[in-house]
Amino acid sequence: MSKDELKDKKRKVEDEELKSKKKLKKDKKDKKDKKDKKDKKDKKEKKEKKEKKDKKSETESFAASASQSDIDEFLKENEVTVSDPSGSNIVPYLDFSQVSFIDQIQKEISKFPKPTPIQAVSWPYLLAGKDVIGIAETGSGKTFAFGVPAINNIVTSGDKSSSVKVLVISPTRELASQIYDNLIVLTDACGLRSCCVYGGVPKDQQREDLRRSQVVVATPGRLLDLIEEGSVDLSHVNYLVLDEADRMLEKGFEEDIKKIIRQTRSTSRQTLMFTATWPKEVRELASSFMSEPVKVSIGNRDELSANKRITQIVEVVDPFRKEKKLLELLKKYHSGPTKNDKVLIFALYKKEASRVERNLKYNGYDVAAIHGDLSQQQRTQALNEFKAGKCNLLLATDVAARGLDIPNVKTVINLTFPLTVEDYVHRIGRTGRAGQYGTAHTLFTEQEKHLAGALVNVLNGAGQPVPEELKKFGTHTKKKEHSAYGAFFKDVDLSKKPKKITFD
């Protein structure tokens, strides 16, 4: 063998040895990285478990400062019922001094006299990391009920990275905007970013906002569009809120909601639902992806009931005299000493609303309107003007009937009765909010006589007078389950462990 051949052979052997050493070194490094990754994951899980345990014990010790007699009186006065599958002995926060949120949040909530009932009862469970279903009348303070613990959790976790951690899904653009307006006060105070995502407006700014926000409020349709085009990552969401879930299903969003939930964490996610009513479809959906949820109910929810702080006046009228009667009512509720009182008028259909709007303007009234024939910009402007007091007369279809928090509405006028008595209760719930008193004046015609019995039940339940003309239509009502509203919450056993579901 020549010298050159020996050199080549030697070089090949050295190359093989070098490759072998490199491979060994790489395998060793990969093994170490894998071990480090596992240790890091185990450490993180251990830390999360400890934090959850500490959070629970802290929650219980703070709540314990309320006396049992005070708690009993509070539960009785507000007709509070709690169904907790785990049987944990958690008591409500009757005062802000009993709860320990971060300073920035404590400063914001202390501007209010005390927690509302839904806040007082749900906060201890939410701070203990439990899934919660909250059922309460509109105007109950549910946005802070779910928003305060959510934002507090982001800050205390120490992870302020720009990924979506809190997701609130809402049925309408108006309600989503309202929730966002409430939450941005807290996120700004805590140095976090939040955004509101809904349809009817360009996507460009929303895409940019989603990249930077930790808290997102969204309607299902637009959010799903952005998910499908790859503009939003929900894999870091650990706090999910479905607000007005019954309305979302009524609007046909069930499949969208399922697809959205699939994009979030399934194991470490805390899930909440806050609403006024619970149809069968939502109860079944809840049982599929909520983990042993605590059901918190404020007020008597066994039968449909109206806020007792609302004076209900029902007049039986000729259907052709309704608009003339409306002008008479506005002289009573919106002129002279009451000229600056906020009055909300409900029509049933958008064409009716357009006609009534023109008629009111013809008669000299400055009226804002929200209905389907208007653009999103026009609707938002109308709502903002009404909220700000620039225009104190608002005409709306049922798009504004659920969840919108418009402060200081003195009177609700039902020009046309809604399709269900449930919607009637939600409509009149725009007044008498946050402990205030209000008036609801309803025009009822023979065309709605099939709803007379159910309406009489609501009036009787709230201790309101029932006009003789209404009784003539009959007071018997057959107990049935409306297609959009369930009759019984407990049809689904929520104590069962959630099953793995497949989203098509």
UniProtKB/Swiss-Prot annotation:
Single GO MF annotation: ATP hydrolysis activity
Subcellular location: Nucleus, Nucleolus
Enzyme Commission code(s) on record: 3.6.4.13
Region (Disordered) location: 1-65
Superkingdom classification of source: Eukaryota
Placement of sequence motif Q motif: 94-120
Residue stretches in coiled coil: none
First-level EC class: hydrolase
Keyword Hydrolase tagged: yes
A Gene Ontology BP annotation from the UniProt entry: rRNA processing
Any one of the GO CC terms: nucleolus
SMART domains, alphabetized: DEXDc, HELICc
Domain free text: The Q motif is unique to and characteristic of the DEAD box family of RNA helicases and controls ATP binding and hydrolysis.
Function of the molecule: ATP-dependent RNA helicase required for 60S ribosomal subunit synthesis. Involved in efficient pre-rRNA processing, predominantly at site A3, which is necessary for the normal formation of 25S and 5.8S rRNAs.
Name of the protein: ATP-dependent RNA helicase DBP3
Source organism (scientific name): Kluyveromyces lactis (strain ATCC 8585 / CBS 2359 / DSM 70799 / NBRC 1267 / NRRL Y-1140 / WM37)
Classification lineage: Eukaryota, Fungi, Dikarya, Ascomycota, Saccharomycotina
